[in-house]
Design a protein with these regions (language model features):
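Non-heme Fe(II) oxygenase catalytic core, chiefly the N-lobe of the double-stranded beta-helix
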Residues: 3-12, 21-175, 192-197, 204-218
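Short His-Asn-centered micro-motif
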Residues: 18, 182-183
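Basic/polar N-terminal segments that are highly enriched at the extreme N-terminus
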Residues: 1-4, 243
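Selective for proline/serine-rich intrinsically disordered segments
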Residues: 16, 42-43, 141, 226, ...
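Non-heme Fe(II)/2-oxoglutarate
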Residues: 67, 178, 185-243
Length: 243
């Protein structure tokens, strides 16, 4: 992780890495993911659901791991992947539902800086498989809210949460880009405003081996068929101190 990205992530709570995937990689993953969504019965059981199929190659993508090792834990054995889902939205579809933000003792939403490094809690990794126009439906953030002293997570302020408050920012990026953010930063989905193409984004939640936020729902048939280097991301939660 570059010093630039490290500082921006700490300052804003998120970073954007444009055009990480090649055009060929984008098309393969997008076509297969839409097939999972629209015609899963045409696939073998272990490829019908994420993270099965070609997407599995992105689980430990170097650009993802370069960040996670700097913001979750420097030991890759202590990083888990606990949730993966597809966000598919046509023109006008979406919602505005701000959440998170402010300091907390909940380890999934806590953001800390200690002894010269970031501990970001749960981290979302978003693969944008179509172009995103700025302020036209990408995920929105209140930058810096992951370190806010006022607890807007449990005590939200309507004038702050309003989309037109002037406090929210989003991003524009080409297809194949990567968005990485701390779950601690206040964020929201938005309404998709691109009539030329839908939003096709894959959201991943990475966490520390010590904690879990999501109820486990991965299909065993999918995980069992992953390569060993990817299966290790789906171990149960435990404290590895005495390994």
């Amino acid at each position: 992780m570059s010093e630039h990205d490290r500082v921006v992530f700490d300052l804003k709570g998120y970073i954007v890495k444009p055009a990480v995937l090649s055009k060929n990689e984008i098309e393969i993953i997008k076509e297969f993911t839409l097939r999972q969504k629209n015609n899963p019965e045409s696939l073998p059981p272990h490829e019908r659901y994420l993270p099965g199929g070609p997407f599995a190659q992105l689980i430990a993508h170097r650009e993802v791991m370069n960040v996670l090792l700097n913001v979750i834990d420097p030991d890759p054995e202590k990083i888990r992947l606990e949730n993966v889902f597809l966000s598919h939205r046509q023109q006008g579809e979406g919602e505005w539902k701000p959440h998170a933000g402010g300091r907390t003792t909940n380890p999934n939403y806590a953001y800390n800086f200690h002894d010269g490094r970031i501990y970001a809690g749960m981290v979302r990794v978003v693969w944008e498989l179509n172009e995103v126009l700025e302020n036209k439906g990408g995920t929105c953030f209140i930058p810096g809210s992951h370190k806010a002293n006022y607890n807007i997570r449990t005590n939200p302020v309507k004038s702050i949460d309003a989309r037109n408050s002037g406090l929210w920012e989003s991003y524009g990026c080409p297809a194949g880009s990567l968005i990485i953010f701390s779950e601690a930063v206040r964020h929201s989905a938005d309404f998709w405003q691109n009539s030329q193409s839908p939003r096709i984004a894959i959201f991943c939640a990475y966490n520390h081996i010590n904690v879990r936020h999501h109820k486990p729902d991965f299909k065993p048939a999918v995980i069992e068929q992953l390569a060993p280097k990817h299966q290790r991301f789906f171990r149960d939660v435990y404290h590895p101190q005495f390994d």
